[in-house]
């Protein structure tokens, strides 16, 4: 039997790896579009600034073809280069288009009519057509210019420093548009505005050279539609990653923005690794996770096997990105989302409510994270040289702060389906510990017992962790049955409910809330507003309210 299981594990891993061809293999050739890219061989800042504005106008033009916009984008991203001829060769690697370089000497005064070099392959009709496209801005562009300030285009630019400041200000906006061009292009632009504010604060973006939102949207749309441009940008990102600490301004900027672009489209995979495997909590030993753990192992090997370009699978439209979809490991994904919802407030802004999300295992993750927040990792504690008393003190401190007992305020439970703004809890103060703005613990989930007098025997948990929280001497009521957040899984046998109540902590500890003296005076509160009196002979009453009360 063991040989069959080993063969299954090897089969699962090889199934992910054997589909990939050799690196550098040339795909079957398809029809290619001709893309004209403009090259300026002189460092003249005036000519380059005119080319910058010309490219912006071509991208925003309402009658420009896709090939016109692709050529304008590649030219735009190549303008800071001292040797544009060599830099544009990065785009030659793309099997999607045929790049034609057109050397330009300048523009006719007062117009955007190109003055081609003798070696440029441009006809008079093409030059006239480009001039018409540059003047054909859509009515959604205000003041006849892509910039917010109407006088920016007409300003003189006779210094290299002036050109670089203006060019970097425009390019950094284009790079920010790359961040969401493949994953959330139709979402509100709140994240883009925050990044613009960040780069303005750093001095990389001058507010005077901000583009209109419509111009930014058109740039993002053009990048999204062109695989050639995205392949070119991927090479730029790889160049930026290889730079040392002594780099130029442009690649330092690209490397910074690249952190927002890397691993886009793989968020579910990395969050699953972080909150499911990274925590190393006992529910990972469930038999239901065995097959999916093998799947995650094969995906980690696939990611390493792809190499440097694995960070840009979404940007490159690589088919391998489908292998990392959470639909291939739904149970452990659901468990990880439950853990992350409790541990990380920002997780509540992540859309994890997929059709395959299992409410049963999501609740396992929620309950486990609530109970495990006060445990101590023995290996880390040994490295720090903590004594048993110090470990107990840390655990008690976390418990008190998570419950909000320091100020006599009971901590409110976390409902992952309510926006974080509606879950604000009063600040909890415990002696000289800084106040917490929000409590991520339920207040009733990890025992609820006041710390009794006398020596407490620590409870040893799975995963090499020890729980130093005091255990109640007696619990007068039975454990609450597991009530899932999803109604479709509510008909669970009682024996399974009894088992779920034991995951992440000891049994019969999650209904009482004790006061500061350790007396069980408050009624226990369960899911959906049910209260359980401390007096077993008293009938339970229905409490109207929600999690936030």
Swiss-Prot record:
One of its GO terms (molecular function) is RNA binding. Transmembrane segments: none annotated. Residues 517-549 are annotated as: Disordered. GO terms for cellular component: helical viral capsid; host cell cytoplasm; ribonucleoprotein complex; viral nucleocapsid. Pfam families: Paramyxo_ncap. The modification Phosphoserine is found at residue 439. Residues 531-542 have a biased composition (Polar residues). It is found in: Virion; Host cytoplasm. Keywords: Capsid protein, Helical capsid protein, Host cytoplasm, Phosphoprotein, Ribonucleoprotein, RNA-binding, Viral nucleoprotein, Virion. It comes from the Viruses. Forms the helical nucleocapsid (NC) with 12.71 N subunits per helical turn and a rise of 5.3 Angstrom per N subunit, protecting the genome from nucleases. The encapsidated genomic RNA serves as template for transcription and replication; encapsidation by N is coupled to RNA synthesis. Forms the encapsidation complex with the phosphoprotein protein P. Before encapsidation, the newly synthesized free N protein, so-called N0, is chaperoned by P. Ncore is globular and carries the regions required for self-assembly and RNA-binding. Ntail is an intrinsically disordered monomeric domain in the C-terminus. Belongs to the paramyxoviruses nucleocapsid family. Homomultimer; forms the nucleocapsid. Binds to the viral genomic RNA. N0 interacts with the phosphoprotein (via N-terminus); this interaction allows P to chaperon N0 to avoid N polymerization before encapsidation. Interacts (via N-terminus) as N-RNA template with the phosphoprotein (via C-terminus); this interaction positions the polymerase on the template. This is Nucleoprotein. It comes from Mumps virus (strain Enders).
